[in-house]
Amino acid sequence: MVRENKAAWKAQYFIKVVELFDEFPKCFIVGADNVGSKQMQNIRTSLRGLAVVLMGKNTMMRKAIRGHLENNPQLEKLLPHIKGNVGFVFTKGDLAEVRDKLLESKVRAPARPGAIAPLHVIIPAQNTGLGPEKTSFFQALSIPTKISKGTIEIINDVPILKPGDKVGASEATLLNMLNISPFSYGLIVNQVYDSGSIFSPEILDIKPEDLRAKFQQGVANLAAVCLSVGYPTIASAPHSIANGFKNLLAIAATTEVEFKEATTIKEYIKDPSKFAAAASASAAPAAGGATEKKEEAKKPESESEEEDDDMGFGLFD
């Protein structure tokens, strides 16, 4: 009976995996190390209506996916990433939004002996409030201390763990005595799957403005290279035409070659006074406008002075 129930459960699990991959075009492969059952329940609740969490044995997940490759061969890209304590989070919504929800579900946790530190752990300089009898813990970890007002005081900030270190019994005991919970655990996004493409979660942080800026920089670099080697492309063509026109004007200015665009330049070269006259003519309207504004600004002042004078005479006549 037990064997039949287990076989039926496996069959239902395979069907569920296939249905989820057919229904949802996007999913995360998530790591679930150190995530307890209560925290997992809270995560499922927070994602309700937005995403579906599927956990299971790696062998069963691989078997279900392989059995569905005939209908969806793109799923084969997921197989190399199903290793360790992992699961799937399926969604139809915005990937970045779901990822942020997963990050919010992380909870602080104390350091336990045997755990692997995922980050740097530093004990800050502080008065611990512990009595002198606890000095041995600090000495075992080479932490400089002094006795201040009958309690142990840590003199300097002390790095106690770095990423990849195994937490020892002394480190775990000391951190717990100081009420320091250095780690936070939750579902960690390892890979993102979207309609047949699989990529790193860091890609979700790239914004449209970043893509636009990178594209524009790439076009500018391409144009610069093409200009330097003399190879015409769409990116470099406007610059090549402008440079060619400048060269053509330079040739026309020093030879008898005539064309419409070079006429003005030739006239200025023959008679520089024309250029000076044109420059002064263009500057005159601007200067005239400024003078008029100054005169207009002065007018109200003079008018107000006259009005004041009139008022004065009227009062004392």
Curated annotation (Swiss-Prot):
Complex formation: P0 forms a pentameric complex by interaction with dimers of P1 and P2.
Phylogenetic lineage: Eukaryota, Metazoa, Ecdysozoa, Arthropoda, Hexapoda
Listed Low complexity bias regions: 280-290
GO BP term (any one): base-excision repair
Disulphide bridges, residue numbers: none
Stated name of the protein: Large ribosomal subunit protein uL10
Locations listed in the record: Cytoplasm; Nucleus
Pfam family, one: Ribosomal_L10
GO molecular function annotations of the record: calcium ion binding; class II DNA-(apurinic or apyrimidinic site) endonuclease activity; large ribosomal subunit rRNA binding; magnesium ion binding; structural constituent of ribosome
In-chain residues carrying the UniProt-annotated modification Phosphoserine: S302, S304
Signal peptide boundaries: none
Major localisation: cytoplasm
Chain segments carrying region Disordered: 280-317
Similarity section: Belongs to the universal ribosomal protein uL10 family.
EC nos: 3.1.-.-
Cellular component, GO annotation: cytosol; cytosolic large ribosomal subunit; cytosolic ribosome; nuclear matrix; nucleoplasm; ribosome
InterPro entries attached to this UniProt entry: Ribosomal_protein_uL10 (IPR050323), Ribosomal_uL10 (IPR001790), Ribosomal_uL10-like_insert (IPR040637), Ribosomal_uL10-like_insert_sf (IPR043164), Ribosomal_uL10-like_sf (IPR043141), uL10_eukaryotes (IPR030670)
Composition bias, Basic and acidic residues: 291-302
Function: Ribosomal protein P0 is the functional equivalent of E.coli protein L10.
Assigned keywords, A-Z: Cytoplasm, DNA damage, DNA repair, Hydrolase, Nucleus, Phosphoprotein, Ribonucleoprotein, Ribosomal protein
UniProt KW DNA damage keyword: yes
